[in-house]
């Protein structure tokens, strides 16, 4: 099998339905094309599954698949992005058929987590990347290399700007539970979200923050056990 990723550009958006078929689909020489019942293509989204079949002129067979609904809500990428943005990673997992995850290379942070007793692996994600709402989550970190490569390590994950320290850059900071020995700078990692624990809070000082972080880690440990 082969997967081809095509960047959706203004030029492609301006193609007519016929141009879309001739330039995007025909070169692949498919025998069957599977689309959703609500599939639309071509300029102003005027192309439909029926139009796709007509333009194909018998060169391939078009199958319009039934839409999937969960609790009466149609499963779609739009809906998945909405629940991720709201921090509902449990519903996101139900819609996606797998837990929501992000990935990237661990970068040097402010070292505050280490000073507080909770060293974190920090990811700065590109703008536009889907990220759960600011808050704290239970989940896993999986290193792509090193002694723990491929292992899912139970973690407490913070998403946000560190308002207690007047931070402005939005980050994903992951504390691997009971593993203060990890050296992850420069390592490509995958962070998987299991359950939301709470929203982001601005604390009045270090002690309340440490107390809450301790509670968060305990809660994450229990959820992931």
Regions found by a protein language model. Name each.
Residues 11-120, 200, 204-213, 217:
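Classical nucleotidyltransferase
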Residues 109-225:
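Phosphate/ribose-recognition catalytic cores of enzymes acting on nucleotide-derived substrates
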